[in-house]
Amino acid sequence: MSATTAIDPEILPLHKECEPDFIYVIYIHAPRDAVWAALVDNKNERAWWVNTRMNSTFKPGGSIVFEKAGKADVRGQILERDDGKRLVYTFHVEGPGPQHDEGPTLVEYTLEQTDDTTKLTVTHSNLKKGGRVRQAISGGWPFVLSGLKSSLEGGKTLQR
């Protein structure tokens, strides 16, 4: 599946004009298909993502909801999907609170197979300078990606 469909018009400029705020690169000793499957798994709670479940069809134009303990924590919209290679979605912290007021941000996963290793690049853009989401993201992604790597390479997850 490689597609882009109707995107919320308010999000389209965000999608096309963002400069990256954070770029994380991690190499995972697993096939690209296994890494992709973990990223788009909508059936299981993700122990590697601090017990977060993602509810989504992962189809462009569709919604994505991150749930912790059965409660929506983050919502977004899938903007692009190219199976096994790329996924782009918006990321908006649920309100009320100061993080909610910071507006939507943009997350992009890019996967490349290199021999028996997958190079996963995560780019997070449109974060408010000095904002609380930016602060949380700066420490959150390294932990989440380390958890994904641990889970895929040895079956163990990290706990916070």
Give the predicted meaning of each segment.
Residues 92-96, 123-130:
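Short, solvent-exposed aromatic-acidic interface loops
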Residues 19-25, 63, 73, 86, ...:
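Intrinsic-disorder/low-complexity, polar/charged segments enriched in Ser/Thr/Lys/Arg/Asp/Glu/Gln
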Residues 23-24, 43-77:
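Short beta-edge strand/loop motif at the mouth of beta-sheet-based domains
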Residues 2-8, 126-160:
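A conserved amphipathic terminal alpha-helix motif
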Residues 1-23:
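Short acidic N-proximal helix/loop "leader" segments that mark the beginning
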Residues 24-26, 75-80, 105-112:
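Hydrophobic/aromatic beta-strand elements that line small-molecule binding cavities or substrate pockets
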Residues 84-92:
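Short, solvent-exposed secondary-structure boundary/capping segments
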